[in-house]
Amino acid sequence: MRLQRNSIICALVFLVSFVLGDVNIVSPSSKATFSPSGGTVSVPVEWMDNGAYPSLSKISTFTFSLCTGPNNNIDCVAVLASKITPSELTQDDKVYSYTAEFASTLTGNGQYYIQVFAQVDGQGYTIHYTPRFQLTSMGGVTAYTYSATTEPTPQTSIQTTTTNNAQATTIDSRSFTVPYTKQTGTSRFAPMQMQPNTKVTATTWTRKFATSAVTYYSTFGSLPEQATTITPGWSYTISSGVNYATPASMPSDNGGWYKPSKRLSLSARKINMRKV
């Protein structure tokens, strides 16, 4: 990719992958069983917005697919619904739901899970999977015997870019000015990485942040406290060059050799053991 010098002055790119993202699926529950009624199978999918970026308001469409197989070899049997907009979802307090319906002849009996693909226009996507459930009394030809206890790991691939010709990024830059220890959201923002100075002038150690109390959960929490940390890109450049100086022929001339005896603070002594 070639960037024109005058068209883009500054670019900040954030790429977040393999994190929980925007959705925390709560239904169907693990080991749930569904069977057709009137030739149609209905599987309600419910999830909560866990507060991580992107929020559900940023998602343009959802795609629901029926999948089976091991976590490292996902086999999506069919797309159950595509281009479902957020307005087509049912919302009850903080729980969003969509009922996926399909014909009983679509597939055979077996263990399945539903893939929830959320599209964020111009930025990327998130993928989540429901817990595994059973389909029984199906009329399809192909039955699946594979069984497992966990669903595939969710994935998030979101990219936001800010240029001098674009609108402000959806990530508020002021988020990076809030001290990390005072942030409470599931997506936290770290300060820009800086380069060390050429000299160390400090003579004593100082703590950057004050100490804080530690509390432990006695039961499982309903939502993750923290899903990811976002760090801004550098607003500066580092120049470097090749050292063209001809090295000396001997290591000692280059400072890469020393006499071992000069590094010893104590000398070894020989002790003669007297026979008894």
Curated annotation (Swiss-Prot):
It is found in: Secreted, Cell wall. Keywords: Cell wall, Cell wall biogenesis/degradation, Glycoprotein, Secreted, Signal. O-glycosylated. Pfam families: Kre9_KNH, Kre9_KNH1_C. Its main location: secreted. PANTHER family: CELL WALL SYNTHESIS PROTEIN KNH1-RELATED. Belongs to the KRE9/KNH1 family. One of its GO terms (cellular component) is extracellular region. It comes from Saccharomyces cerevisiae (strain ATCC 204508 / S288c). The keyword Signal applies. This is Cell wall synthesis protein KRE9.
